[in-house]
Amino acid sequence: MDPPSLMSDGSSWSKLPLDLLIMVFERLGFVDFQRTKSVCLAWLYASRMSAPNKQIPWLIMFPEKGKDFCLLFNSEEKEKIYRIQNLGVEFANSHCLAIYGSWLFMRDPRYKLYIMNLFTRERINLPSVESQFGRIKIEQINDDLFYRKVDDEYDYHPKRHMIDISDHILWIDDKTKDYVVMWSFECGYTYMVYCRTGDNIWNYRSLDISTVNIVYKDHKMYLYSYTRDVKVLDFCEDIPRQIFETQVNYDILMEKGFRSDVDDVLNDKKEHLVVTLNGDVLRVKSKIWDNSDVWSFCIYKLNSSNTYWEKLTSLGDEAILLDLGITVLANTIEGINRNSIYFSGYHRPHYFRFDHVWSEKDICVFNLDTQEVERPHQSICSSIQISGARWFVPNFKHI
């Protein structure tokens, strides 16, 4: 298809080669990209063949249950918020488990799982959670309560019947719609459950570790365990295979023995795994003191022999999106704070041993240089009641 005729006003900027325009447009942020579309017909045509820079973090905010819209906040525009409306009754009563690009991994009130595109409304239904995994069978007792049977029998201890479905992960290719969806549960060790394009049942792999956090990036699954070890599984083939494992010198019992009573009582903390642009793995510890709304963070990187976590004081020109477990380049992109951590709070309330309730104050950008917290969204969201939020990197190809 040939581009439309160019405007005949003699302006040379309207006659730039299409390849050059596309190259320029793909370097723009969202705001400048939208402005360039209105310059002339040739620029509008070029914009439809490209997309704004994909590495700018946006914040998606979910209102109270029963509302069929969500809110988007762009880091480039400090005083503006976008509303995506009419997302449907099912969306209004669903809960977001994970996000990738412009796709949401959702569960409805009956714990039916699906993924949907925020902008096109395209939806893909996923298999039922009630499944058989070798000797283990998962049964749904009520809306969000699941029991497990081993060899078709319940465990002798009633509380051990219950399983906690966690570590929700989504990856999808916007062009081909190929996807990978994951979640996990514990039964002695971690069972990693996954579904790929074309699957009508859940596949699984039992792991000989108990995981704290899982990240999926570049067709690899990174697992972080309670012993502070990292395993990497390659998902390029039908059956995932292990390609990397650490042997970290860490004694969890010794650390607990030396922990002070004050530290144990006055704060709550969680550890996260992050994979950098060049494939390095980082350990990020987030901590909040009881009766406080101020978060603090520490970052660690494996030493050269992969046996010890060393404290890292700078990310250089990268920034961490903790919700996604990745870093993005921040040195040339307006709207991203370099050497910072983008955080939206804990998404599983049972992490908290105290009465800390999630609020919009948990959404923040932590600057590693100053050790200070910024809440860029707060001035425009103070009057809006939200129930949750996540930082993500949207794909605006279909806008």
Curated annotation (Swiss-Prot):
Any Pfam family matching the protein: F-box
Domain F-box: 12-48
Coiled coil: none
Protein name: Probable F-box protein At4g22060
Organism: Arabidopsis thaliana
